[in-house]
């Protein structure tokens, strides 16, 4: 693939991405032999898999929050395959941050990539937003954890001693 063909493909991928046609992006990139794709097309392929996993073509997943775990894990594997080239690339860190957040519901892991993205592109409002979102998820997780501990403590205090001696309510 020469430079003009690659530029044309990249433009077409952007158009399909804007139209939520992620499967078309995947088919077009996967039609190119893996050893000829290079870094940028591998990252674009990962983006297409990630978007398909989370949004579906033409938003078919809607807002149900359901994520195709196999597709999102494949997106991460693709990013891992070009980690050496991507670690200092804001775009690679962005894709890894979003994918990890969706794959594992892990704001901790996603936040690491988001902060790296922000360090590499401090003026990028999307990087700033992902860091804020991850930090909010982490705070919500801590609050939920505390809430569960508080509830458990209340239940222990309110459970009569004879029930405790029998080993609990459900025995």
Q: PLM features: residue spans?
A:
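Amphipathic alpha-helical repeat scaffolds of TPR domains
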Residues: 2-11, 35-61, 87-102, 125-137, ...
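Canonical positions in the second alpha-helix
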Residues: 31-32, 81-82, 116-117
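Amphipathic alpha-helical repeat elements characteristic of tetratricopeptide repeat
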Residues: 3-7, 23, 69, 73, ...
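Short coil/linker segments at helix-helix boundaries
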Residues: 50-81, 101-102, 109-110
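Solenoid-repeat scaffolds in large eukaryotic assemblies
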Residues: 24-25, 58, 110, 143-147
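Short helix-adjacent coil turns
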Residues: 20-24, 105, 122
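N-terminal leader/linker segments that initiate helical-solenoid repeat arrays
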Residues: 1-25
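TPR/TPR-like (Sel1-like) alpha-helical repeat modules
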Residues: 64-76, 107-126, 132-139, 146-158
């Amino acid at each position: 693939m020469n430079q003009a063909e690659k530029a044309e493909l990249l433009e077409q991928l952007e158009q399909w991405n804007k139209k939520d046609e992620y499967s078309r992006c995947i088919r077009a990139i996967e039609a190119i032999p893996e050893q000829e794709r290079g870094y940028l097309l591998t990252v674009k392929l990962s983006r297409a898999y990630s978007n398909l996993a989370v949004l579906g073509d033409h938003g078919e997943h809607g807002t149900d929050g359901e994520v195709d775990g196999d597709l999102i894990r494949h997106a991460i594997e693709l990013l891992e395959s070009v980690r050496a080239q991507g670690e200092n690339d804001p775009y690679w860190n962005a894709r890894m941050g979003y994918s990890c957040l969706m794959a594992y519901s892990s704001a901790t892991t996603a936040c690491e990539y988001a902060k790296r993205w922000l360090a590499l592109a401090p003026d990028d409002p999307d990087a700033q937003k992902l860091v804020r979102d991850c930090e909010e998820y982490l705070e919500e997780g801590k609050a939920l954890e505390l809430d569960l501990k508080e509830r458990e403590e209340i239940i222990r205090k309110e459970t009569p001693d004879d029930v405790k001696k029998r080993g609990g309510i459900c025995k």
